[in-house]
């Protein structure tokens, strides 16, 4: 019986050591991968997961006006499984308009606009085609002097 007890004890200690070492290794790797630019603050709401959604559904403008003084001009609101980051003001929203497609994709939002123009046009095409269509639209809509 003593042999089984010591074998179990040694195995348990070995497993604990492996988990501790694995945790240390993964935590050191995750610290190295952190972004140089800090992420925007996240709105903490109660109850978790649905608190932000409830406030957002009551009035998104009210939520923005209440949280802007507390969280600043850039902050994130968690709505169920989605994160929505708000950029308030011209000094921070310029990045939104000038960002590369690889940095800031609007693909999910464009899906809602497909019925407006139809399939294969503007919001239902790849980025290079969309940019070409935007150039065409902008030149067609310019006022000639």
Swiss-Prot record:
Family in the record: Belongs to the cytochrome P450 family.
One MF annotation (Gene Ontology) recorded for this entry: heme binding
Protein name: Putative sterol 14-demethylase-like protein
Gene, per the UniProt record: CYP51G2
Highest taxon in the source lineage: Eukaryota
Tissue expression as described in the entry: Expressed specifically in roots.
GO biological process: methylation
Deleted gene: phenotype: No visible phenotype.
UniProt keywords, alphabetically: Heme, Iron, Membrane, Metal-binding, Methyltransferase, Transferase, Transmembrane, Transmembrane helix
Organism: Arabidopsis thaliana (Mouse-ear cress)
Main location: membrane
């Amino acid at each position: 019986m003593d042999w089984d007890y010591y074998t179990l004890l040694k195995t348990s200690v070995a497993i604990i050591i492996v988990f501790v070492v694995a945790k240390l290794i993964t935590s050191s790797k995750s610290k190295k991968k952190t972004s140089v630019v800090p992420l925007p603050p996240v709105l903490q709401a109660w109850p978790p997961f649905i608190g932000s959604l409830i406030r957002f559904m009551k009035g998104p403008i009210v939520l923005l006006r209440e949280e802007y003084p507390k969280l600043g001009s850039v902050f994130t609101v968690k709505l169920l499984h989605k994160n929505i980051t708000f950029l308030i003001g011209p000094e921070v929203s310029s990045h939104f308009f000038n960002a590369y497609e690889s940095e800031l994709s609007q693909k999910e939002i464009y899906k809602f606009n497909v019925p407006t123009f139809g399939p294969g046009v503007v919001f239902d095409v790849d980025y290079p085609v969309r940019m070409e269509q935007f150039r065409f639209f902008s030149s067609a809509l310019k006022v000639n002097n």
